[in-house]
């Protein structure tokens, strides 16, 4: 049995131009809201692949850091810029020779003292 108050005041919905959620009913697929599920497996596979790739990259970085620590490629005390005090200490530790050791080196040398001076890029004739 119908409610008499509804039958007299409710408009007729038989019109074909019914609009639901701002869209014409005849233009939309009634399942358009759920169409994303059509490719759900492909989407999940793609996301899983991206997660595996991120994990792989993270492991690579971790291995690189461990290798760097193992080989001590980066030593902050050696590789970072030094303070002015450290540079001054190293400068003060340098010894200026009086030249006598240089003369000893020349006397004990096996080089030819009469040889022409080497100039890069200049070709000399056959000797």
UniProtKB/Swiss-Prot annotation:
Residues 1-24 are annotated as: Disordered. It is found in: Cytoplasm. Residues 22-75 are annotated as: PABPC1-interacting motif-1 (PAM1). One of its GO terms (molecular function) is mRNA regulatory element binding translation repressor activity. Acts as a repressor in the regulation of translation initiation of poly(A)-containing mRNAs. Its inhibitory activity on translation is mediated via its action on PABPC1. Displaces the interaction of PABPC1 with poly(A) RNA and competes with PAIP1 for binding to PABPC1. Its association with PABPC1 results in disruption of the cytoplasmic poly(A) RNP structure organization. Only the PABPC1-interacting motif-1 (PAM1) interferes with the binding of PABPC1 to poly(A) RNA and translation initiation. This is Polyadenylate-binding protein-interacting protein 2. It comes from Homo sapiens (Human).
